[in-house]
Amino acid sequence: EKATIRAIAGTAGIDPSLVMRYYGNKGKLFAAAANFDLCLPELSAVSHEELGTVIVQHFLERWEVDDTMVALLRAAVSNEEARLRMVEIFTDQSLPAFEELLTDHAAERAALIGGQMIGFAVCRYILRLSPVIEMTHQDIVNWMAPIVQQYIDTPAP
């Protein structure tokens, strides 16, 4: 967020006007550059009862090791291109994994799980809410896995 177009262009060895010409602003440049692979595990290989646990553990590990997703989430709140990039990550990566796994309302279930995980990420990595930031990984999994599992198991209304 503190980077300037001039500094970015200088690092790339190009004129700042080229960055502005092709991207328009820093937000659009960031959204175009943000590359994040969720590296989802093969969920079909996980026992049904363990899906909530595996999903929460995986997302927690991904958010902890790569600042790109936190930066993209922060930008998505106020920048349309970053928001669209987040939607693209969901549509291209999360949704297909859940569609292979669940036949009943897979898109809705994936969206609810994604919302749960993103809401948690906002609290822990952006707002840095206490006690969320003090919780251990195991505490987080213990609290959140049953909720995610419920999204998977509960019959659709």
Region spans (language model):
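A short secondary-structure junction motif
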Residues: 33-37, 66, 93, 120, ...
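Amphipathic alpha-helical segments used for helix-helix packing
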Residues: 34, 63-91
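Phosphate/oxyanion-binding loops and surfaces in catalytic or ligand/nucleic-acid-binding neighborhoods
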Residues: 36, 62, 79, 120, ...
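Short alpha-helical scaffolding segments that buttress acidic/His motifs in well-ordered protein cores
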Residues: 59, 72-76, 113-117, 121
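Amphipathic alpha-helical segments within well-ordered protein domains
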Residues: 73-74, 95-99
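Hydrophobic/aromatic-rich alpha-helical bundle segments in the mid-to-C-terminal region
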Residues: 84-87, 98-157
